[in-house]
């Protein structure tokens, strides 16, 4: 059973900035594509994160946006053939929460070089351009779900 949360309404530009980042583009590229200054796009992102339960990191804001359907959900992908190690799988919820390598290392009680290596390999396996894009890919592969994200919000 899927838990529900309050519907979040993002302004058009807030949604466009978040969706652009979700595709793996940089904030500067998203701003250019929207023909606004990077500082303006940063402001839109800041407002969106505030609306998305005050998410401090863009990865978490994106996960919350997907869970609350505040932005367009990405098309699902077939997870067959996606081969992630246990170490990489452990990173999934922590990256989606926007935790840093240091925070993840502390949480999992693992050396930082192992966390960095697993993180880089996870992004390669997901064919993700960056950590924000990884959240999209994890959602597409159904390794990150609305129920998981909503559980963090409670």
For each of these PLM feature ranges, what is it?
Residues 26-55, 100-133:
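Recognition helix of helix-turn-helix DNA-binding domains
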Residues 53-79, 124-154:
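Basic, Lys/Arg-enriched C-terminal extension of HTH/homeodomain DNA-binding domains
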Residues 2-12, 71-87:
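Regulatory hinge/linker segments at domain boundaries
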Residues 21-25, 92-99, 138:
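Short helix-to-turn junction characteristic of helix-turn-helix DNA-binding domains
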Residues 15-16, 89-90:
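Pre-recognition alpha-helix immediately N-terminal to the DNA-recognition helix
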């Amino acid at each position: 059973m899927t838990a529900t949360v309050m519907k979040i309404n993002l302004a058009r530009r807030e949604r466009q900035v978040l969706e652009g980042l979700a595709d793996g583009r940089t904030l500067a590229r998203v701003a250019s594509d929207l023909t606004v200054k990077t500082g303006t796009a940063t402001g839109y992102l800041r407002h969106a994160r505030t609306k998305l339960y005050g998410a401090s990191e863009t990865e978490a804001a994106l996960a919350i946006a997907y869970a609350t359907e505040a932005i367009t959900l990405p098309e699902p992908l077939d997870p067959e053939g996606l081969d992630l190690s246990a170490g990489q799988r452990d990173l999934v919820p922590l990256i989606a929460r926007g935790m840093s390598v240091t925070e993840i290392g502390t949480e999992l009680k693992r050396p930082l070089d192992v966390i960095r290596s697993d993180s880089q390999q996870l992004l390669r396996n997901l064919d993700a351009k960056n950590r924000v894009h990884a959240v999209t890919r994890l959602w597409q592969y159904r390794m990150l779900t609305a129920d998981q994200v909503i559980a963090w919000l409670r």
